[in-house]
Amino acid sequence: IRDTDRSRGLGDVYKRQGFYRARTHEVIDTRECLLVKPEADAAAEAVRQYMRDFRAAGYDERTGRGLLRHVYVRSNTRGECLICLLVNGKRLPHEAELVERLRRACPKAVGIVLGENTRRDNVILGERYRTLWGADRLEDVLCGRVFRLSVPSFYQVNREQAERLYAKAIEYAQLTGEETVLDLYCGAGTITLALAPHAKRVLGAEIVPEAIDDARENAARNGVGNAEFFC
């Protein structure tokens, strides 16, 4: 999300919301993207209108000023989604109004989370999270296992290709059931748990504490007893 010049006649600040132009930090205004689920486009449009109506400033990474940085939407096979708003601060103006708009735009949303990110860089995810409404995690099914996913936990964005990728990795590994397998940067444990039936022991390592919490719970929920996770 970026502010552009005051050039539309009424002193209004037009908000650009979309994706980066290749090899730049310039945001290209995007109303629809065929690569994302419809609920992501709907959430982005609701935030766009909220910013216009309440003059909420988009973040400018050149100056470190402005509030809204990113709209982060994670969806599952049931069409449900978890929405996270990444902000340069602790609060948004008129938070309750924004929550209602997002719930109307995305009726299958399970939760809306605010993430604080005051870093002066282009890292997307935040340092702290606060649930504005609903759940703080989303459930999804991958490789026949159910995973609970918090906002900071890494998860493959293309579920169908991830399943093919994991199957090919297992094939190439040629495990006999006697190995100890180390999964570095394991996120919520998706690859670790996919490998578990084929190895004696699987170990996942990750620097994000929330992801390790998710991975441990996912192992327990799926009845995987030979997996351990470390942060």
Regions inferred by a protein language model and the residue ranges of each:
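Single conserved hydrophobic/aromatic residue that forms the stacking wall/gate
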Residues: I1-Y14
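Peripheral terminal and linker regions in Fe-S/redox and tRNA-modifying enzymes
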Residues: D12, A46, Y50, H70, ...
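Extended interfacial segments that mediate partner engagement and assembly in macromolecular machines
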Residues: D12-G58, R78, L92
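Short, acidic/hydrophobic/Gly-rich beta-strand patch recurrent on exposed beta strands
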Residues: G18-R21, L86, A215
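Short, aliphatic-rich beta-strand segments
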Residues: D29, V73, G79-N88, V146-S150
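Short edge beta-strands and adjacent turn/loop segments
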Residues: G64-R78
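Rossmann-like S-adenosyl-L-methionine
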Residues: H94-C231
